[in-house]
Amino acid sequence: MPVISVFGIPVDFILFALTLLGVALFHHHTLRVALTGLAAIVAYKLAFTAFPTGPGIAGLAAHMQHEAVILSNLFLLLMGFALLSRHFEESKLPDIVPAYLPDDWKGGFALLVIVFVLSSFLDNIAAALIGGVMAREVFKGKVHIGYLAAIVAASNAGGSGSVVGDTTTTMMWIAGVSPLVVVEAYVAAAVALVICGIPAAMQQHKYSPIMKDAPAGIKVDWTRVAIVFGILIIAILSNVIANVSFPWILDKLPIIGLAVWAVLLATAALRRPDWSVMPETFKGTIFLLALVTCASLMPVERLPVASWQTALGLGFVSAVFDNIPLTALALKQGGYDWGFLAFAVGFGGSMIWFGSSAGVALATMYPEARSVGLWLRHGWHIAVAYVIGFFVMLAVIGWRPDAPL
């Protein structure tokens, strides 16, 4: 694929960097900026270079066909989990959570631990949204941006050591990486949770303390609770069964997304989903898909030589670059310690709000989180936690690379 460079930097990357800069500067117009950037990159490739699958319209069509399952699965999950989070909120179950959490900053930290655990077996989007709903209730609607960033970090950390907790770890599993290798990421993830979770919980306690007791007279809608758990169980089962018994179908159909929507529609007669959240969720979803598509169009055909330094750097890259193609390239190249890579590309995306699908989903629920400046300023502890967690894992386990797969 021909590449045109300016001072050694491919023009594709310059256009992508300008798009990300626009998202950071104009956080009230993120969708427009992302779509404009995507249009510019596509136009440039049509006119001057080529797509990863070839030149011209045919190359674009082939590329979009190649990305169709990933994009459609993200679309279905983001839209579906938004409805799930509303079912969860309207069930009133989050309203009784304060009765079971400590009354000071430790209550906020305990909530982050819950999100971490949920994400170990749920999709991190669902875990982040459930955490966002609970935070809204227990903090009386006032949630600090630093704490929102920590919710995203907790959801990404919890999924980093589980082959069913994150798309990237599932990719490793499909490629033949043992789940026992991936689970080592929890050494770094647990440390990172503590390092970022405690400061975030203290930020939140100072901003708006946790409710000391649950409001009186709360009546939980157990039918909605059952719907929520039904969706989550079916999503988990569809993921595991497809990966174990029918891995070929994962390249053909967005299995998990379809499973989520099948349960949502099947249970609509019992409790009507809150369709009113769809317009705003749709905007956030298209924004993420635009950035993911931009990233997939970049001329990244290889990574630096596999090493712990490269893995550490990929964590920072994943904050602005979709971690799915990064993981695919790493698997193709081989020579990584997959536990380190799982933590790096999983947790690293938490450093900026649009660095992970969980962050974009939560920012749809909390629009104030769409400011990169505020996210970096108040979520400073995430980058610190990433570096400390990585080096603790390096000291405890050591870099043990596998042979190419």
PLM segments and residue spans:
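Cytoplasmic-side transmembrane-helix entry/capping segments in multi-pass membrane proteins
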Residues: 31-40, 98-110, 143-153, 276-289, ...
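Membrane-interfacial loop-to-helix junctions in multi-pass transporters
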Residues: 8-13, 70-74, 100-113, 139-149, ...
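Transmembrane helical segments that form the transport core of multi-pass membrane transport proteins
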Residues: 231-336
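Interfacial loop-to-helix junctions that mark the boundaries of transmembrane helices
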Residues: 2-8, 25-30, 56-74, 178-188, ...
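Juxtamembrane and boundary regions of transmembrane helices in multi-pass small-molecule transporters
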Residues: 84, 90-93, 141-145, 149, ...
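Short helix-coil transition sites and intra-membrane helix breaks within transmembrane domains
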Residues: 27-30, 84-92, 118-130, 158-166, ...
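Hydrophobic mid-bilayer segments of alpha-helices in multi-pass membrane transport proteins
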Residues: 10-20, 27-55, 71-83, 224-234, ...
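Hydrophobic transmembrane alpha-helices that form the pore/transport pathway of multi-pass ion
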Residues: 106-160, 171-175, 328-343, 368-371, ...
